[in-house]
């Protein structure tokens, strides 16, 4: 009974974190729905950043209570930082190559690509750079790693099949069942590997944040 209860708590936590992760985007869509586009980025950015930081704070608080951030100081070890930067560079170029391959062979699912692109552009185009940075480099890494790494491993245990399950779900949520999934697999594998090797959530958060920032800038 205790086992079932503990697993139920983890599932509930994952769903709650997922709902939290959607709040800033829903709020931004609400702000955009009034039809007044004059100075919209200047109007949207401050409240979006405030809400996003509140969401991130709640997520971190929940993560601390769930034990997600144990041994977080290990992320600052120089060998770990070297590994993360090495994976960052390798993953970045592999991802670029895979996306180029998919694009050049016209393998993208057009309907999904348009839907996903519209959502991303809707969020980013109506925000100033600080808001875009907070969304891409802070909100997404912390919330997604808490869900697809910490919660998954807490729920299913530290097994090889958990590794593959985490990789798949992270990629699937971003792409659906289409060739697009290949574009997300390199990052998904790198993030899951970083977490799987010693279960330090801040490792995968750091790699995720750096990768998103790199894509955002370039």
From Swiss-Prot:
A single Pfam family it belongs to is Rce1-like
Cellular location of this protein? Cell membrane
For this UniProt record, give its keywords in alphabetical order, as a comma-separated list: Cell membrane, Membrane, Transmembrane, Transmembrane helix
Q: Please list the GO terms describing molecular function.
A: endopeptidase activity
Q: Which GO terms describe its biological process?
A: CAAX-box protein maturation
**UniProt main location, coarse:** membrane
Entry coiled-coil feature ranges: none
Q: Is Transmembrane helix tagged as a keyword?
A: yes
Q: How does it sit in the membrane?
A: Multi-pass membrane protein
Q: Where are the transmembrane segments?
A: 8-28, 48-68, 81-101, 123-143, 163-183
Q: Which domain of life is it from?
A: Bacteria
Q: Report the GO terms under cellular component.
A: plasma membrane
Asked if Heme is a keyword of the record, the answer is no
Record family assignment: Belongs to the UPF0177 family.
* Protein known as: UPF0177 protein YaiF
**Originating species:** Lactococcus lactis subsp. lactis (strain IL1403)
